[in-house]
Amino acid sequence: MTEEPIKKAIEEIKLFNKKHNLIARGSLNQQVEESVKEGAQLALILQDKESILDLGAGSGLVGITLATKIPAAKILLGESNKKKAYHLKRMIRATQLPNIEVFSQPPKNKKIKVQAITTKAFKTIKDTLDLLDSMVHKPFSVYFLKGREEVFQKELVEANILNKNHEIIKMDSTKDRFIIKIINE
């Protein structure tokens, strides 16, 4: 699959961002570039997954990158903010990717099944895991996109993750960026 859907998604983000503050305008180009790089690195890790939920999808660029680079996977963009969910639906139509959809909220009293969850700038590790326990069938793996190591190490302690199955992956970038993989069985 070509990179064309990613280019279309970026156009949609820039257009939508003129009227709605989806991404801080001063850092738009930097945030877009960073999200594409993060999505590409996650795609390398998640190549074998059939279903992925991008929780707190925001601009949707990480999810669009995943859908473009892993065309066999079903990608769900989890976003409860109505304005952002509207943007995501517009972006999906513009990219014409068949393997991606918006997931606004879980069905009542019913858990969803996905193999992997990605999240960036959503909630703390503990709060995210608590939420996922109530909405996703186990087993699943969560891939947290995190910044400074001292911050996420505190979150790991708070969530009592140090005794659980986890992996810290340094991202290929100049900034302090990490992927924290936690297997939730």
Predicted segments with their positions:
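Active-site capping/gating segments
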Residues: E149-E185
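Conserved SAM-binding strand-loop segment of SAM-dependent methyltransferases
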Residues: Q96-P107
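A short glycine-rich, Lys/Arg-flanked "PGG" loop and its adjoining helix->strand segment in the class I
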Residues: L129-S141
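A short acidic, Gly/Pro-enriched loop at the edge of an enzyme's catalytic core
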Residues: N109-A116
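Conserved SAM-binding motif I beta-strand of class I
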Residues: K74-E79
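Conserved SAM-binding loop of SAM-dependent methyltransferases across substrates and taxa
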Residues: S59-P71
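Conserved beta-strand signature within the Rossmann-like core of class I S-adenosyl-L-methionine
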Residues: P139-E150
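Class I SAM-dependent transferase core
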Residues: M1-D48, L53, K83-P98
